[in-house]
């Protein structure tokens, strides 16, 4: 994640410059991609914001593992809930902007000189496809965070249970604690032996952790669904780019074959001219050889 945006977007400026150079070299008016790249920059800024929030969630999750106080867990829960809500908001904005970019690309193909396979179209399609791939990386990162949080929550509940009861909880007990959050029901023996006040903080802490994990998981599932909605767009752009590259490759192949055939024709033409010259020269030589013996007789007749 640290290097996710450090160098990925440098190519967009290069692609823009290349598209403009291609248009100039082909004798066409340079296509205006400024608005397109301005929209791309907006998407990039939102994606960087999502990355920052992801790091904040990571840090809060790490801090939560070392906390043993229900009040502090509650504070961290509120912070993480806020971060996830911001992530959802930004990702939904990114989705809308990606869809708008894809629509703009489709409209651009109707402009003269910007049709499928043109340098402008290849640039637009490549950039949108690249943005989609970065979103895929983000999606995988959040899925990984969600899995880690669930696994770490389970480990924390196991440790707290052992600390209070001195017993190793079986898998079913841990699953029941995690699914219900009703830790008091599973700690009756400890409450009877130590008193409710002795373990109240731990019970509250487990409850806060349960509520935090469930709420964050619900939001992360919603976030994942938004990512999945964008996956179709990413796949479509990737396939479109592959189709364009395939057409360009085929066109280049046809051009190369045409050039080779033209070169062969020129060589054949040169060869034909050469042999024609040889034939004419041979005819002249033969004619001269036939004419020389008869030349005295012809001269006598002329006299």
Swiss-Prot record:
Pfam families: SNARE, Syntaxin. PANTHER family: SYNTAXIN (PTHR19957), SYNTAXIN-124-RELATED (PTHR19957:SF314). Residues 107-126 are annotated as: Disordered. Part of the t-SNARE complex. InterPro entries: SNARE, Syntaxin, Syntaxin/epimorphin_CS, Syntaxin_N, T_SNARE_dom. GO terms for cellular component: plasma membrane; transport vesicle. Residues 31-112 form a coiled coil. GO terms for molecular function: SNAP receptor activity. Belongs to the syntaxin family. The chain crosses the membrane at residues 280-300. The gene is SYP124. SUPFAM superfamilies: t-snare proteins (SSF47661). Residues 203-265 form the t-SNARE coiled-coil homology domain. Keywords: Acetylation, Coiled coil, Membrane, Protein transport, Transmembrane, Transmembrane helix, Transport. Residues 301-303 are vesicular. Residues 1-279 are cytoplasmic. PROSITE patterns: SYNTAXIN, T_SNARE. This is Syntaxin-124. GO terms for biological process: intracellular protein transport; pollen tube growth; vesicle-mediated transport. It comes from the Eukaryota. The keyword GTP-binding does not apply. It is found in: Membrane. Its main location: membrane. It comes from Arabidopsis thaliana. Vesicle trafficking protein that functions in the secretory pathway. The modification N-acetylmethionine is found at residue 1. It is a single-pass type IV membrane protein.
């Amino acid at each position: 994640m640290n290097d996710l945006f450090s160098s990925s977007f440098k190519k967009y400026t290069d692609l823009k410059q290349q598209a403009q150079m291609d248009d100039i070299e082909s004798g066409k008016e340079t296509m205006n991609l400024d608005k397109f790249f301005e929209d791309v920059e907006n998407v990039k800024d939102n994606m960087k914001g999502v990355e920052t929030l992801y790091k904040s969630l990571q840090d809060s999750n790490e801090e939560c593992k070392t906390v043993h106080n229900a009040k502090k867990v509650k504070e961290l829960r509120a912070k993480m809930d806020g971060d996830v809500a911001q992530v959802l908001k930004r990702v939904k904005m990114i989705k809308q902007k990606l869809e708008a970019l894809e629509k703009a690309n489709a409209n651009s193909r109707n402009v003269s000189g910007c049709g499928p396979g043109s340098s402008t179209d290849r640039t637009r399609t490549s950039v949108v496809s690249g943005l989609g791939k970065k979103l895929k990386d983000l999606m995988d990162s959040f899925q990984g965070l969600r899995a880690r949080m669930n696994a770490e929550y389970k480990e924390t509940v196991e440790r707290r249970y052992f600390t209070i009861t001195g017993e190793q909880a079986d898998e079913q007990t841990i699953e029941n604690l995690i699914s219900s959050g009703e830790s008091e029901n599973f700690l009756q023996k400890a409450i009877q032996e130590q008193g409710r006040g002795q373990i109240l903080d731990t019970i509250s802490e487990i409850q806060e952790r349960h509520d935090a994990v469930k709420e964050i998981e619900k939001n992360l599932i919603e976030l994942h669904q938004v990512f999945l909605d964008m996956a179709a767009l990413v796949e479509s752009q990737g396939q479109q780019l592959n189709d364009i590259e395939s057409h360009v490759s085929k066109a280049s192949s046809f051009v190369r074959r045409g050039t080779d055939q033209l070169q062969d024709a020129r060589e054949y033409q040169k060869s034909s001219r050469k042999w024609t010259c040889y034939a004419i020269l041979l005819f002249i030589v033969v004619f001269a050889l036939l004419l020389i013996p008869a030349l005295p007789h012809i001269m006598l007749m002329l006299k």
